[in-house]
Amino acid sequence: MAHTKTRRTYGFLMVLLILGSACGNLVASGSAGSPPSNEPGGGGLSEQVVLDQLSESDLYGNNKRAWQSLQSSWGKRSSSGDVSDPDIYMTGHFVPLVITDGTNTIDWDTFERLASGQSAQQQQQQPLQQQSQSGEDFDDLAGEPDVEKRAWKSMNVAWGKRRQAQGWNKFRGAWGKREPTWNNLKGMWGKRDQWQKLHGGWGKRSQLPSN
C-alpha cells in the first residue's frame, strides 16, 4: 500500500515537470516570434532613443530656419528695400571717415555743416532765439567761415592733393626721376667701357707687335 502511494507521488511529480517544461518552451517560442518591443529592456529601441532622434530632427529644422533668417540679414539683400531717408547720415548712425594730418582743430558741428553742404548764408539765418546771444558769440560767428576754410584746407591737403613738403620731394626723387648714381650704374653695364682691352684677350686675336 505504501509502495503504491510512493509510485503515485513520483508519477504526479513527473507530470508536473513535463507540464512545466512544456509551458517554458511555449513562452520562449512566443517571445521569439513576437516583434521587438519599444519598452526599455526589450529587443527594440528604447523610448529615450526615439525621443533623442525626434529632438535631433526638430533641432535641425530649427537651426535651418534660424540660419535662413540670419542669412536674410547679411547673406543676401533683404526685402525691406534700401534706405530712402537721406538724413540718416547725419543722425549718428553712420560715422564718416575723416583723414587729417593731425593739425586741424575742426569740431564735429562744423564738420557736419561742411559735409551737409550748407553755405555761410544758411548758417547765419538762425532762429530768433539764437539772435539774442552776446556780442562775443556774434564775433565768433563772424570769424567762423575763415576758420572753417582754413580747417578744410588743412584737412584736404592730406589726401585731396599733393602736399608740397620736403618729405614728398625726397620721396619723389627716390623713384620719380633719375639720380646721379644712375649714370654711374649705367657706365658699368649700359655702355661699353674699356671694351678694346677686353676683346683682345678672348674675342679675337690681339694685334701683336711685329718684329
UniProtKB/Swiss-Prot annotation:
Residues 1-24 form the signal peptide. It is found in: Secreted. Induction: Up-regulated by sleep deprivation. One of its GO terms (molecular function) is neuropeptide hormone activity. Transmembrane segments: none annotated. Ligand for the sex peptide receptor (SPR). Stabilizes sleep and maintains sleep homeostasis to inhibit the activity of wake-promoting circuits, such as those that involve the pigment dispersing factor (pdf) neurons. Regulated by the circadian clock network and pathways associated with a sleep homeostat. May also have a regulatory role in gut motility. All five Drostatin-B peptides activate SPR with comparable efficiency, however Drostatin-B4 is a slightly more potent ligand. This is Allatostatins MIP. The gene is Mip.
